[in-house]
């Protein structure tokens, strides 16, 4: 929670006075698809990403009158050291290797979202499908994430 939520929340509040003075000011928070739909065995991580999504929505409302855009980026698995260090499960490491997005690609999409002021960006087709499924058929989404994580 300290890294995924508390730090971005405090940094956002600290940046506010500078953002108010800026031309076309914007703030981008990096969430996760797991901030839209929780999955088994990643409870704390999911909770922190739900929190950053909620913070982003609240700041967007609070800062709208100041002309500050508040953006939220939701990547799926990114090829980083997170899985290597945090998860010992061989299946998880294999899953990462097959489906992880390159950090450079995440950065490119983030930059495009910034330039075009896209407020909520889901990065992958699989992530979009999971969010969509959770909205229209939450029981099926629950079954799917329980089955395949």
Q: Where are each of the predicted segments found?
A:
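Active-site loop immediately N-terminal to the catalytic Tyr-X3-Lys motif
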Residues: 39-43
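Catalytic Tyr-X3-Lys helix of short-chain dehydrogenase/reductase
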Residues: 16, 51, 56-64, 69
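SDR active-site lid
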Residues: 62-125
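Residue(s) in the substrate-gating loop at a strand-loop-helix junction
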Residues: 32
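Conserved catalytic-site region of short-chain dehydrogenase/reductase
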Residues: 35-37
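Active-site helix of classical SDR
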Residues: 12, 48
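A transmembrane-helix-recognition feature enriched in membrane-embedded lipid enzymes
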Residues: 118-149
